[in-house]
Amino acid sequence: MVRATPIHRYRNIGIMAHIDAGKTTTSERILFYAGVCHQMGEVHDGAAVMDWMEQEQERGITITSAATTVFWSGMDKSMPQHRFNIIDTPGHVDFTIEVERSLRVLDGAVFVLCAVGGVQPQSETVWRQANKYFVPRMAFVNKMDRTGANFDKVVEQLKARLGAYPVPMQVPIGAEDGFEGVIDLLKMKAIHWDAASQGTVFEYRDIPIELVDKASKARAFMVEAAAEATEELMDKYLNEGELKEQEILEGLRERTLKVEIIPVFCGSAFKNKGVQAMLDGVIHLLPSPADRPPVQGLDEKGNECRCKASDSEPFSALAFKIMTDPFVGSLTFFRVYSGVLNSGDQVYNSVKLKKERVGRILQMHSNQRDEIKEVRAGDIAAAVGLKDVTTGDTLCDQNHIIILERMIFPEPVISMAVEPKTKSDQEKMGMALGRLAQEDPSFRVKTDEESGQTIISGMGELHLDIIVDRMRREFNVEANVGKPQVAYRETIRKSDVKSDYKHVKQSGGKGQYGHVVIEISPMSDVDKQHPDVKGDFLFINEITGGVIPKEFISPIEKGLRETITSGPLAGFPVVGVKVKLVFGSYHDVDSSEMAFKLAASMAFKQGFAKANPVLLEPIMKVEIVSPEDYLGDIMGDVSRRRGILQGQDDSLSGKVINAMIPLGEMFGYATSLRSMTQGRATFAMEFDHYEEAPTNIADTVIKKT
């Protein structure tokens, strides 16, 4: 089959924003104007197409990244048809994992900002994630019809708070109730959308006289930004004082692709103004898969190699999301980087070293699906029938093996115990939690060996609430939930602590003998770069002359690794520790793998106790936005929670307080902040780092365990 849309007309984009910036409404308008939906869904009615989970419709927030394909030929239908693969990502801080994995497979992004709230805490988190993957992006300042809307202030905040270089492509005509349309700085014309046609009909008019001066200055700034792309453009601009429309677009596009500038559009998705012109901007300014650098990976020998975005290259794709569908079972969302895949083909999972057959390939439209026969470089689709694939796995041609760069997921910071309400729920709960953990790499499940309880861990209270909710709705499992628990860690402060342990048992029959001498130290910054570091633990074998035979070295390491999952201090995982195996002895007959494993485990426990062990607690970066009247109360409360104030800022929604607060002090904070400020303040928090817990806190935690 021949490719339906040339690859240079593809745009794989994410719609990203802070919660409540109007991101899902913006996505709904895109679907409407692109002709996918003949009726608009609204978030506040719980009818948004992109928010397809029941919890999303109830809570009015987006939790999972819904993927949708639409086609766009320009606002005036004058451009060749372009294919947009759009991913709508969640804005709540507990779901940053969804944003992270979407960004990994996107080529560009539209950053939706609220014209009233401006750059919010979550905006900064999402921005950092986009920087990490070097994603070219543009901004859409939404909600220009809202009271307090201020386009210029938001542009200023993009510069001040995110360190971006914003280049406005439009100037709004009016604001709040008086928002009428936008001035297109390329054409120097005013665009007015017709309300009766829900914005499908528009007309160009002359710029209102009172805005001519402002528009001219903004255009000069835009043209200058374009001219800086190349020496030729700069020479032409300096000599002639102007550039042609096509030259301006080429210059701006080049700089956007290098992530040097952020083109800024504006409008009101709810009032059907501006989204249409922003879509034209996606075509003009954001990259196609062919514009992005070839994706890097490793071949089977571990050498670096690259995948070019071309159908003629061998097949390679990245699985970026697993989802359980009530009708077809497990769905694997994947992005094709190179080559072609037909339904029924065999693919090789180069991470799991397994071959699998792709049953059906589905083109997803939120949670609707169309079956397709093939996918090509640049496509984003879902496969049915892949059993062993997990998020971050590479799928490739078995004759051309490649492992694409893996995604790194954050460690959970909060845990709680769950138990089934009835005997019949017991079996179903295990299956439900297994499925949910397969879908979401930032969610973990384990069984506490001592109590037999099932412990679930995640990125925040809301994250775990929704997991429990999904268990009830999707899997019909009723569960009782314990109080949230903090994910503490254990480490040591003393270096070069020697520990010598001999495991000997000789009471008739075959005996047991294992003897190890280890040195325990905290990991230095240099140690952290060591190639053998696995999971914040470093094992170094310094045995020479065969004092311990080679076959026992691996069991020794295994014994150590098993011990650090539950530290000697209070049963929390041990982090940041280096163990050197320096000496030992063995017995020709009585030595065994088990004996050395036990000796290593006991040597570690004894050494750890002598190495000044400490408890580490997770510290959260908290940002509180509140009217000024409540500042004193909020700051006092932050101090009572052992928080350290990092500074204050002004935002369009009030004062912004930045603080570092231990997670253990943050449970129930939403309720407390609400009552302190009559519901007028909001906050967002994300994990920042681990820090040594004060002695009184550590003692209390250790006593409880």
Swiss-Prot record:
InterPro entries: EFG_II, EFG_III, EFG_III/V, EFG_IV, EFG_V, EFG_V-like, EFTu-like_2, G_TR_CS. One of its GO terms (biological process) is ribosome disassembly. It is found in: Cytoplasm. PROSITE patterns: G_TR_1, G_TR_2. It comes from the Bacteria. Its main location: cytoplasm. The keyword Protein biosynthesis applies. Gene3D superfamilies: 3.30.230.10, 3.30.70.240, Elongation Factor G (Translational Gtpase), domain 3 (3.30.70.870), P-loop containing nucleotide triphosphate hydrolases (3.40.50.300), Translation factors (2.40.30.10). CDD domains: EF-G (cd01886), EFG_III (cd16262), EFG_mtEFG1_IV (cd01434), EFG_mtEFG_C (cd03713), EFG_mtEFG_II (cd04088). Residues 8-290 form the tr-type G domain. The keyword Cytoplasm applies. Keywords: Cytoplasm, Elongation factor, GTP-binding, Nucleotide-binding, Protein biosynthesis. Catalyzes the GTP-dependent ribosomal translocation step during translation elongation. During this step, the ribosome changes from the pre-translocational (PRE) to the post-translocational (POST) state as the newly formed A-site-bound peptidyl-tRNA and P-site-bound deacylated tRNA move to the P and E sites, respectively. Catalyzes the coordinated movement of the two tRNA molecules, the mRNA and conformational changes in the ribosome. HAMAP family: EF_G_EF_2_B. Belongs to the TRAFAC class translation factor GTPase superfamily. Classic translation factor GTPase family. EF-G/EF-2 subfamily. This is Elongation factor G.
